[in-house]
């Protein structure tokens, strides 16, 4: 069985407390408010269990209460927010059951995707992935963990897009939203970011060899690391998890 590093004393990543500007998102005002709140929750800028104060959010974003309330309702439907009558609105704590289910769905989709892509990947697609890995390495060297996290996600998104199935990413985003948030917890663990880059390089090597089985094996190893690292964090940070 894979063993994580012994040090789990580091605090989970907490991003900048400010919400991202609405101008960074497209769509209606309501959708923009939803997106910036969603990103704040996924990035752990809003900590699990933290109360969401709508007046403060309205003031920071410069919007009325209506789009904020609508956004909170959407987030509650996704399981990212808990609305407790007469008590308040809170960022949902992590649920290991939901994370395990999301990890199962993620593996089912991404293993099939990587195997399919390895059979037909083009040189242009390989160049795009190499470029992404180069930036990942640079961000790791700079100690930019949030930036690395973003490029990590973009690499997986590229691989899914290379399947040619246009609906796959939307399905993926919905199916493992809790996994995406949980990944933020494991990146600060000593050595985890460097190990992630090494795993990405192994995936890349299998794709360059156009070896579907090797690509599948490398992706499986990479994906299964999450729970290996996350379970000890549940013990060391119980306040972030549902009992």
What feature does the model see in each segment?
Residues 1-119, 124-125, 161, 216, ...:
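Short linear motifs at protein or domain termini
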Residues 28, 126-127, 191-194:
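Short helix-capping and inter-helix turn/linker motifs at the boundaries of alpha-helical repeat units
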Residues 41, 117, 140, 207-210:
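Hydrophobic residues in alpha-helical segments
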Residues 86, 109, 131, 195-198:
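Alpha-helix N-cap/N′ positions at the starts of helices
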Residues 167, 179-183, 187-190, 227-234, ...:
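Short amphipathic alpha-helical interaction/hinge segments
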Residues 189, 212-218, 238:
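Hydrophobic/aromatic-rich alpha-helical bundle segments in the mid-to-C-terminal region
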């Amino acid at each position: 069985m894979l063993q994580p590093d012994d040090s789990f004393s580091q605090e989970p990543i907490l991003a900048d407390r400010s919400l991202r500007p609405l101008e960074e998102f497209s769509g209606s005002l309501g959708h923009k408010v939803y997106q910036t709140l969603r990103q704040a929750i996924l990035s752990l800028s809003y900590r699990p269990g933290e109360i969401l104060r709508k007046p403060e959010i309205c003031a920071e974003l410069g919007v009325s209460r209506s789009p904020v309330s609508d956004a909170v309702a959407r987030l509650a439907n996704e399981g990212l927010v808990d609305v407790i009558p007469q008590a308040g609105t809170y960022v949902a704590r992590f649920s290991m059951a939901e994370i395990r289910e999301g990890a199962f769905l993620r593996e089912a989709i991404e293993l099939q995707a990587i195997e399919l892509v390895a059979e037909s990947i083009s040189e242009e697609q390989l160049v795009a992935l190499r470029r992404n890995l180069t930036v990942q390495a640079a961000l790791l060297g700079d100690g930019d963990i949030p930036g690395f996290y973003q490029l990590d996600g973009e690499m997986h998104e590229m691989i899914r897009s290379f399947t040619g199935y246009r609906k796959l990413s939307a399905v993926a985003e919905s199916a493992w939203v809790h996994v995406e948030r949980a990944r933020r917890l494991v990146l600060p663990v000593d050595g985890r970011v460097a190990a992630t880059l090494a795993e990405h390089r192994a995936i890349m090597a299998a794709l360059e060899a156009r070896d579907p089985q090797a690509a599948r094996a490398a992706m499986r190893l990479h994906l299964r690391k999450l729970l290996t690292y996350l379970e000890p964090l549940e013990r060391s940070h119980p306040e972030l998890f549902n009992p």
